[in-house]
Amino acid sequence: DSEHNAIFQCIHGHEQSDLACIHLTASGGPFYGRDRASLVNVAPEQATKHPTWDMGAKISVDSATLMNKGLEIVEAMWLFDLSPEQIDVVIHPQSIIHSLVEFNDGNILAHMGVTDMKFPILFALTYPERVELPMERLDLTTMKALTFDAPDFSAFPCLALARHAAKAGGTAPAKRSRNGLAPEVPV
């Protein structure tokens, strides 16, 4: 994931004890700004039309429901030895900032880049070197604003469910209730 790659690059060279929290960014997907009632009758085709990333159908649906962000919370816990309380999700519709790391002193480092998975893949394959390839670069002069918003947990219950499972710990993400449905999650 570009988010975890971004976190790794931001924390590299810093002590774990200096880390206050991380902020995973989410574009909000095609349904950003809509409330739960307006999402009742959406069609699968609508969910696959991501506004900033070019992805396959399943990943696009996971993004549209914010389920992917929930899974990224669990991943970040294990990859970076963080508690669920140290992981926040913020909606960033421009998808320019891939994640942010906040330190105990209040400083925040952000990883910025174009929406192209070639960059995090290149970094992962060539680390610790930095290899230059002819790829599109981020042009800071074209950006007019970078905005952030809190996620709407009632409109996107998958994110609430994943956060609940992360806090429960263990194998909670794999557990089901007796009737086979996911447990009711407070939002």
Task: Pin down the residues of each PLM region.
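Catalytic, metal-anchored helix/loop core of enzyme active sites in primary metabolism
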Residues: D1-V187
